[in-house]
Amino acid sequence: SPHAVARAICDVIGTSTAALRVCVVKALEALVYSIARVRDLRKAKSAKITLGKAIMDFEFSDEQELLREQARGFLADNCPPMAVRKVLDSDAQYDAELWQKVVEMGWTATVIPEEFGGLGLSYLELVVIAEELGRAAAPIPFSSSVYLATEALLMLGSQEQKEKWLPMLASGEAIGTFALAEGNGRPAASNLKTAATGGSVTGRKIPVADGGIADFAVVVAASNQGDGASLHLVELDQSGVSREAVRTLDFTRGHAAIDFANAQSELLGGDGAGWAAMESLLDRAAVLFAWEQVGLADAALEQARDYAMGRYAFGRSI
């Protein structure tokens, strides 16, 4: 129940504040309600809302629903809970075998244009895949490489950068990541310590999701131009880069601290326009992360329901 989950969360963070418990319970209840509403919309013959004369259609297309069925079936076969737990309980940074199968399914190429070796599908197809990956808690670098690195190149990359990296991202030959955080505190352009000068980057980024396995990173660095930041593409297999694994609360993916010492870099987009570009990139990625969370919460709700329906105590079903 939401109350039981709330108590567990409070125990983990070491507090017994009644107000916090109430907030957690209310948030969970709202999430459960939202999931129920999503289910209702999916099951309804028409998931449309009329606003005046305008009609907003929230239904997925038949092709997108077919993609959902295929993705769910694939992950049920290749990413069951026991397989996920095995990866999370080991020192492996990701499930390499599952990642290769995901690449073969073409998911890493979903929104990459056909001219760069992709499938040229829409963001909605990626939303469907994101929900199913979240449902399975798949321990692979999909979000880092697809939601962030690929999207950064699509938004800001030059023709030459796109021609070099997008085909490799689509085929799984390369894995990308995004490096913003520099430790404690909320990142801001005014307190960035990582700097870029003369085609090189120097600084430390921690934590970087999937930073230990990525081939390149999109690095947010300070700039004395424009909004105070710029984005740089840095290949991670070079002498000016060192990486160290770090532990975080997110066990579904590996994290690393990455040190850059005059590491060669390429500017992505305009110098001094990086912060606004980063915010736009993260806003788009947040939609996909939210759908992952909907998928995971929906799976948890289904498991809790099935457990409650089959659980007997004191001679009767609970």
Question: What are the functions of these language-model segments?
Answer:
Residues S1-S16:
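Extreme N-terminal basic, low-complexity initiation segments
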Residues A18, Y33-I35:
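Short terminal hydrophobic/aromatic SLiMs and anchors at protein ends
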Residues K43-I55:
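Short, Lys/Arg-enriched N-terminal segments with co-localized hydrophobic residues
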Residues F58-Q70, R135, V241-I318:
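Glycine-rich beta->alpha junctions and the first turn(s) of the following alpha-helix
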Residues G172-E182:
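A short, Trp-centered hydrophobic/proline-enriched beta-strand micro-motif
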